[in-house]
Curated annotation (Swiss-Prot):
Secretion signal span: none
Xref: Pfam families: EPSP_synthase
Molecular function (Gene Ontology), one example: UDP-N-acetylglucosamine 1-carboxyvinyltransferase activity
Cytoplasm is among the record's keywords: yes
SUPFAM superfamilies membership: EPT/RTPC-like
Catalysed reactions listed for this entry: phosphoenolpyruvate + UDP-N-acetyl-alpha-D-glucosamine = UDP-N-acetyl-3-O-(1-carboxyvinyl)-alpha-D-glucosamine + phosphate
Pathway membership, UniProt: Cell wall biogenesis; peptidoglycan biosynthesis
Protein name, per record: UDP-N-acetylglucosamine 1-carboxyvinyltransferase 1
A biological-process GO annotation: cell wall organization
Source taxon at top rank: Bacteria
Family per record: Belongs to the EPSP synthase family. MurA subfamily.
Positions of modified residues (2-(S-cysteinyl)pyruvic acid O-phosphothioketal): 120
Length: 427
């Protein structure tokens, strides 16, 4: 099993880093390519991540032709043939986000059989909102032997109110509605930038989607969609991770192509902590002086609130700010597992239900730790940068799902970090 080894204590990050296309955007975009019954769809600025390879397999398994040019960061999908109805367990079980193929398959074929999803084990992440919305559009759903089977002679528009602004459910319903009869209105819809990016692609394919980025999205169904060329939006979570890395090491880093508007909640909290954040033509610059960092209170919320996908990394930043900080996690259950690993490094923290209290400014020591999920893996590596001595982070399968060349980018900024492959250790 690969490991990342960090020599901590003196890792002030300086320089510039370029951000990849967004993982959370490209996966539903790949699912959307199934909707194009005419022409090829080309996605540009595609990140090279294990989740992308899995989604390519899912789409390819539906009888679409998928060509991934890694050097060009480009995926071409030809879904003009007969799309099959079943997304098999061997692919879908590896990644939770693959459930978003359910809506597109239904829209194209009228019958879908999709394995229950896998991925990060972060609390209870039910898919009932996906299913309730599809039922409102005339879909009959049954769950048997680990599969969701959905049938509809013809999807019809519906007025759907979501109890929670689920990103995945919003994406699934948007895609299903593009080829439905009539108008679909989704209220309390997710408002993330990745939702907007999906709407842009769908409209480029000939769909009629309005209101993406607001709490009410309206989709007027059309007869068919066609291929197009689309550039994947930049990854705001990767950008945020490097903002935090610069802040917690007292660094000076330009995050190229980062979008201020997409990172506004994070930037607000960085400024509150005493971090200098500057919008420049090429991206966002982050500077900090460790002695100026102040403890803060943060609560995760659906967008435009503070993103849950930045919670773990921000708790790492809290470890170097003197005083007691608090982090309240309202989006997912069981998302403080990384703090248990940080305690092995000397972190003083307490978890009471959905709230973590973190005592910052205390010396941390390097240790051997294990990643528990995607964002936790990044948080543990960042903590290793500021801990004294050597930190070894294992279970990198999580890291590779969402960060491309993470250790290399940190090393280019001055971090003492290397990745040791399993074969290297065996020699």
């Amino acid at each position: 099993m690969d490991k990342i080894v960090v020599q901590g204590g003196d890792n002030r990050l300086v320089g510039s880093v370029t951000i990849e296309g967004a993982k959370n955007a490209v996966l539903p975009l790949l699912a959307a390519t199934i909707l194009a019954s005419e022409g090829k769809t080309v996605l540009q600025n595609v990140p090279i991540l294990s989740d992308v390879f899995i989604m390519n397999q899912v789409v390819g398994g539906l009888n679409a032709k998928v060509d991934f040019d890694e050097e060009a960061h480009l995926v071409k999908v030809d879904a003009t043939g007969d799309i099959t109805e079943e997304a098999p367990y061997k692919y879908v079980s590896k990644m939770r986000a693959s459930i978003v193929v359910l809506g597109p398959i239904l829209a194209r074929v009228g019958h879908a059989k999709v394995s229950m999803p896998g991925g990060c084990t972060i609390g209870s992440r039910p898919i009932d909102l996906h299913l309730k919305g599809l039922e409102a559009m005339g879909v009959k759903i049954s769950q048997t032997a680990g599969y969701i089977e959905a049938k509809a002679e013809r999807l019809h528009g519906a007025h759907i109110y979501m109890d929670f602004p689920s990103v995945g459910a919003t994406q699934n319903l948007m895609m299903a509605a593009t080829l439905a009869d009539g108008v679909t209105v989704i209220e309390n819809a997710a408002r993330e930038p990745e939702i907007v990016d999906l709407a842009i692609l769908l409209n480029e394919m000939g769909a009629k989607v309005k209101g993406a980025g607001t709490e009410t999205i309206t989709i007027t169904g059309v007869e068919k969609l066609h291929g197009t060329t689309h550039n994947v939006v930049q990854d705001r979570i990767e950008a945020g991770t490097f903002m935090v890395a610069a802040a917690m090491t007292g660094g000076d880093v330009l995050i190229r192509d980062a979008v201020w508007e997409h990172n506004r909640p994070l930037i607000a909290k960085l400024l509150e902590m005493g971090v200098e954040v500057i919008e420049e033509d090429e991206g966002i610059r982050v500077r900090s002086q460790l002695e100026n960092l102040k403890a803060v209170h943060v609560k995760t919320l659906p967008h435009p609130g503070f993103p849950t996908d930045m919670q773990a990394q921000f708790t790492a930043l809290m470890t170097v700010a003197k005083g007691e900080s608090t982090m309240v996690e309202t989006v997912f259950e069981n998302r403080f597992q990384h703090l248990e690993e940080m305690r092995r490094m000397g972190l003083h923290s307490e978890i009471i239900r959905d709230t973590a209290r973190i005592v910052g400014g205390q010396p941390l020591q390097g240790a051997e730790v294990l990643s528990t999920d995607l964002r936790a893996s990044a948080a543990l590596i960042l903590t290793g940068l500021v801990a004294q001595g050597e930190t070894v982070v294992g279970k990198l399968v999580h890291l590779d799902r969402g960060y491309y060349g993470f250790h290399e980018k940190l090393a280019q900024l001055g971090a003492k970090i290397q990745r040791i492959e399993a074969s290297d250790e065996d020699e």
